[in-house]
């Protein structure tokens, strides 16, 4: 009898998912026709060309205001940054976070947690030597791991390395790559990422296609029917249990630190947060509690691991596609760095390498709409009144592909960031980290990681594809609201520098 009920539940669940697939299409309001299934950002770009810089679409039953183009985005998220600073919530996100953490919160909670997170990163050396040394240490472990392979899909190795940089900030130490707890953490944090970028986990090294065939529609269904989903059996129960296991580990680590806490010298994010908790323990309105600490640590992992590792994977894919560009980068590395360990200070002396990394991020367009915002009050914008709580998407891809800002927006061309003298040239349209009050708080860390990992690996290795360059597809995969690199295997050969 129990087995029959379970099968009935599963059949009903599948029926709901099939219906959901039809309901979740972005619908063009004026004509009532479903948009092309080429990814939400691509579809929104087409609408912006038709309806202008501000328009509304519906995602299922949810109205969403889209802001497109550099000028309109700047007006909204810089000039009216406070009004547009809220974070839109989804039921699945709220179930995982309960509204805690810097990424999903709004108002006072978000401001307090963001200020504390930025100060902690600064104190631990974001842009200074200490974090730089942690990254340099991790590049050595990655280089040793690469030496063990011939043909390889590099995504798991790269993801482990970036995850360990975050681990050193959160926990004060790195893990061995095969450490069971580290692998649990690496499995779990993309789960939070996927709630923002459906399909992202489909390409993650730790999950199978079969797993994703469930989770992709599940997250969508959960957002529409959060109370109903709990009545059905399935992998989602196991998923939430695993997530809670990782969260429990973080809390346990914090409680261990509390026993021997040196309040004058915090060694990691958890200790810095504990000190803040002790300082404000008598404040009934404090936002510094265990729940916010755990979810803020989660946010650093989920936002910092997959994004940076995906960008690095795209970088090496571009080098395989364009071996002449790879050769120029390696020559600049040889001329400026030689055989010593790369440092952040080298970047200003390496305009071509810097331009290549900027162009990879522009071309890839990892987060075309960022994490969805909401307006925190009724807001007038471009002669429209946007009601409080309305979801807002900044269409950053409309800026990164603007021909008025980039001379070759549809091609991979490092010249977009070089002047006529070969010097690095900044561009206001370079917005891969967002804009305004909710700009990525780990931007400086990500820039440091990208430069040091990229130069360290190309200093020692040459990347080549398992097929000719002209057959390599470098176009990122559309993944609902985001873009991710093509999955690939490659040859990583040790360089012989004369």
Describe the function of each predicted region.
Residues 2-21, 58-65, 125-137, 146-168, ...:
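Cytochrome P450
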Residues 27-36, 40-134, 153-154, 158-165, ...:
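Cytochrome P450 substrate-recognition site 1
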Residues 33-52, 245-248, 252, 340-383, ...:
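Conserved cytochrome P450 K-helix E-x-x-R motif and the immediately C-terminal K′/meander segment
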Residues 122-126, 198-202, 214-218, 239-312, ...:
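Conserved cytochrome P450 catalytic core segment spanning the I/J/K helices
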Residues 162, 166, 171, 242-250, ...:
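Central I-helix of cytochrome P450 enzymes
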Residues 323-325, 443-483:
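Cytochrome P450 heme-binding "Cys pocket" and the immediately downstream C-terminal segment
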Residues 382, 420-450, 475-479:
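Cytochrome P450 heme-thiolate "Cys pocket" and heme-binding signature region
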Residues 394-421:
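Conserved cytochrome P450 K-helix/beta-meander segment immediately N-terminal to the heme-binding cysteine loop
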């Amino acid at each position: 009898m129990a087995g029959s009920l379970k099968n009935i539940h599963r059949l009903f669940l599948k029926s709901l998912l099939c219906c959901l697939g039809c309901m979740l299409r972005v619908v063009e309001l004026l004509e009532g026709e479903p948009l092309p299934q080429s990814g939400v950002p691509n579809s929104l770009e087409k609408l912006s060309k038709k309806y202008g810089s501000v328009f509304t679409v519906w995602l299922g039953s949810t109205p969403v205001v889209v802001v497109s183009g550099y000028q309109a985005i700047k007006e909204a998220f810089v000039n009216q940054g406070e009004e547009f600073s809220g974070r839109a919530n989804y039921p699945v996100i709220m179930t995982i976070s309960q509204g805690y953490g810097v990424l999903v919160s709004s108002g006072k909670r978000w401001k307090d947690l963001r200020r504390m997170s930025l100060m902690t990163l600064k104190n631990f050396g974001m842009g200074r030597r200490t974090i730089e040394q942690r990254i340099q240490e991790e590049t050595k472990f990655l280089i040793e791991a690469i030496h063990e392979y011939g043909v390889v899909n590099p995504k798991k190795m790269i993801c482990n390395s970036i995850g360990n940089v975050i681990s050193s900030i959160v926990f004060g130490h790195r893990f061995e790559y095969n450490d069971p707890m580290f692998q649990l953490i690496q499995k779990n944090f993309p789960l939070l990422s996927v709630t923002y970028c459906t399909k992202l986990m489909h390409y993650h090294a730790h999950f199978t296609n079969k797993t994703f065939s469930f989770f992709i529609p599940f997250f969508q269904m959960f957002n529409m029917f959060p109370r109903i989903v709990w009545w059905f059996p399935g992998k989602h129960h196991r998923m939430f249990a695993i997530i809670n296991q990782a969260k429990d580990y973080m809390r346990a680590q914090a409680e261990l630190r509390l026993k021997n806490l040196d309040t004058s010298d915090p060694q990691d994010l958890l200790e810095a947060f504990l000190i803040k908790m002790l300082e404000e323990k008598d404040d009934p309105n404090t936002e510094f509690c265990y729940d916010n600490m755990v979810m803020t640590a989660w946010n650093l992992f989920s936002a910092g691991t997959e994004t940076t590792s995906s960008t690095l994977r795209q970088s090496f894919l571009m080098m395989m596609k364009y071996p002449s560009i790879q050769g120029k980068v390696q020559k600049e590395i040889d001329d400026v760095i030689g055989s010593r360990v790369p440092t952040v200070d080298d970047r200003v002396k390496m305009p071509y390498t810097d331009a290549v990394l900027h162009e990879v991020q522009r071309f890839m367009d990892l987060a075309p709409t960022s994490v969805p915002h909401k307006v925190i009050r009724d807001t007038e914008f471009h002669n429209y009144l946007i009601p409080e709580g309305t979801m807002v998407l900044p269409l950053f891809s409309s800026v990164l592909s603007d021909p008025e800002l980039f001379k070759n927006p549809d091609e991979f061309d490092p010249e977009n960031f070089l002047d006529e003298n070969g010097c690095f040239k900044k561009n206001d349209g370079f917005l891969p980290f967002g804009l305004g009050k909710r700009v990525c708080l780990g931007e400086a860390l990500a820039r440091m990681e990208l430069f040091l990992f990229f130069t360290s690996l190309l200093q020692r290795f040459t990347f080549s594809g398992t097929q000719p360059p002209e057959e390599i597809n470098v176009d990122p995969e559309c993944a609902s609201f985001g873009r991710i690199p093509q999955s690939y295997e490659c040859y990583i050969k040790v360089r012989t520098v004369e």
